[in-house]
Amino acid sequence: MTDLCNLRCRYCMPDGVDKLEREDILTYEEFLRLAALFARCGVDTVRVTGGEPLVRKGVEQLVKGLKAIPGIRKVTMTTNAVLLEQQLPALLEAGLDSVNISLDTLDPALFAKITARDEFAAVQAGIHAALESGIPVKLNCVPQVGVNEGELEALAALAQDKPLQVRFIEMMPIGYGAAMPCISGPELLVRFRRRWPELAPLPGAACAALGDGPAVYYTVPGWKGDIGFIAAVHGKFCASCNRVRLTSQGFLRPCLASEAGCDLKALLRSGASDEELLTAIRTTIWEKPQEHHFELKQDIPATRGMYRIGG
């Protein structure tokens, strides 16, 4: 819903990137019109992302509008949590169902190095507020070679006494992350099992209950939370992928690794009817590529930042 962010993580949106013009971004009314059409196609879950969604004013009104759409059963948000503590009450009142929080380190100095901002205390306050509120919380960590790889066990251990899911997402070869080496999910699982030999996978039904996507979850008896792995490169899950992404500019992308898609904003602003938009949405979804080829690291523009796609 926005390309703006109040952090500058080097693998997503480093300093110096160009901002989009305001008129290039979909309005909330346009987002809601499209969301209602997606619901007519069978979409029942919407995740609000950015950039950082909380930097866009009135985001709680978007959440409220999404929750009012027939067929939409769940609205979630991915955030860096810098502004979460102050905005959480309004989001909860609007009906937000869960929150995913990006966190790559528990070290304030390393946090500042990764993000180029000194906001660790604000993020911790946001996480604490979310846990205290009772809303389901997931933490998303991107393991980075030579950066935070020594902290991954400490991050995983948060699930021991907190009711949350700590997920480890492989670095995707997209945009600024393409030049960075990947710590694979299977490699990380071996490491964690050396630390916690009792770490065992949750049954499929339990995994499904925790989320709507590709994460595979593990836990240790007695833990309050779980550890998840999203291994897009080393554990390709294309056959079961149930995602499409609508960028802040209104471009519908059926696959992160593909340039294929449809400019829904152009259709919206040229006066397209709902039926014409539905046809475009359905056609794009049906043309979703069979699988990605992240392992080949080709045909993916090096400057296509995740902050503009929906990270």
Language model features by range: what are they?
Residues 1, 20, 52-56, 144-148, ...:
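Short, small-residue-enriched loops and turns at beta-alpha junctions
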